[in-house]
């Protein structure tokens, strides 16, 4: 008897399903992957598709066979002498292939799992990563990531130019073309520029001053002079589906002394990571080295005045078909391997100064890392 992986989802939202099939569809479909003997990326891949999608799947999907859902449903109906459910159709396929053991992702439907167990199948939830090979990127994937990154850098440059060309008002707010320069306006510019480059941005962060002390505050309202403005931009390419992630922090006017010191410390934190990252290194060691550097410079982390301040998030994360993927570069142990693409995004956040974060993307190599990001890191604009 064989063991197979089973996915029932839409590949527009399910990155594992898109990774395995390279077929994009907005409605759920059935995918069965009979693994190779060594558990690698090989094996036999089968799609079970509706009449609506079967011909497109045959021409676009990177699988071994595409079967008709309607035909399997007809066979199941004859066997059961009743209208079949989706799980009856799955059973029809698996029984014909002598498959009785199934691996499913942790977010697989409980109702589907129960129905399969009632039909005598062994169903095991496979912990993430469902496809571990997703963590190490191919040359094609790195090219896709870089393509999205270049588009993001161009959009970010347009946003920074707007801030640079704005005028400082007596109340320290910024105006451009006679209108207030707001977080919403910069976000709109970023999204429009990315759309022109076939990228889609969501939850883009444009946070100024105290708002930026909360790293995931998307930001709102007027942008102000002499305060750090954090822009964290992470779109997905509409065609390739691969993400990019970049953060830059700028100040219009003159940055206070503490902000300058924070900026320099964060840049040095990145340099520490670049010197340490290579094949076989534990990401937690990289994270600790940056924390130690911040502490040595007097930038302490912990709860202060009722809120977290300092450096209280991870140094980085993998990305690809999802914005956050394994591995993590954080306090958790994760061994980095050549071919992984991770972000390097240390930050410092204090209520009396605002937030500073700088983020690049790097490829882990045998002896170090290759920085993919090319955008300049300039505080004063």
Segments predicted by a language model, with ranges:
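Active-site neighborhoods and metal-handling regions in enzymes and metal-associated proteins
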Residues: 1-381
């Amino acid at each position: 008897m064989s063991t197979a992986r089973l996915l029932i989802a839409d590949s527009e939202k399910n990155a594992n399903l898109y990774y395995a099939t390279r077929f994009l569809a907005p409605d759920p479909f059935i995918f069965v992957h009979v693994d190779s003997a060594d558990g690698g990326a090989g094996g036999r891949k089968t799609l079970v598709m509706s009449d609506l999608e079967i011909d497109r799947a045959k021409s676009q999907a990177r699988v071994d066979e595409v079967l008709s859902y309607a035909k399997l449903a007809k066979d199941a109906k004859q066997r059961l002498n009743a209208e079949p459910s989706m799980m009856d159709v799955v059973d029809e396929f698996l029984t014909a292939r002598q498959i009785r053991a199934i691996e499913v992702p942790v977010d697989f439907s409980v109702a589907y799992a129960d129905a399969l167990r009632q039909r005598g199948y062994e169903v095991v939830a496979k912990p993430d990563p469902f496809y571990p090979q997703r963590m190490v990127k191919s040359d094609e994937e790195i090219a896709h990531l870089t393509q999205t990154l270049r588009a993001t850098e161009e959009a970010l440059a347009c946003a920074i130019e707007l801030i640079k060309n704005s005028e400082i008002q007596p109340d320290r707010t910024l105006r451009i073309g006679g209108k207030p320069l707001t977080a919403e306006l910069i976000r709109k510019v970023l999204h429009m520029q990315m759309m022109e480059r076939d990228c889609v941005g969501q939850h883009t962060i444009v946070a100024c001053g105290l708002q930026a002390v909360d790293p995931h505050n998307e930001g709102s309202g007027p942008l102000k002079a002499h305060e750090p403005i954090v822009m964290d931009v992470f779109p997905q390419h509409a065609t390739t589906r691969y993400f990019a992630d970049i953060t830059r922090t700028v100040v219009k006017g003159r940055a206070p002394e503490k902000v300058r010191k924070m900026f320099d410390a964060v840049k040095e934190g990145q340099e520490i990571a670049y010197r340490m990252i290579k094949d076989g290194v534990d990401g937690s060691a990289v994270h600790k080295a940056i924390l130690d550097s911040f502490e040595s410079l007097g930038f302490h982390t912990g709860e202060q005045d009722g809120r977290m301040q300092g450096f209280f998030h991870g140094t980085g994360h993998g990305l690809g078909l999802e914005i956050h993927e394994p591995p993590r570069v954080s306090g958790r142990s994760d061994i980095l391997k050549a071919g992984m693409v991770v972000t390097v995004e240390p930050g410092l956040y204090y209520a009396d100064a605002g937030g500073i974060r700088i983020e690049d993307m790097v490829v882990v190599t045998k002896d170090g890392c290759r920085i993919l990001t090319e955008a300049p890191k300039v505080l004063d604009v």
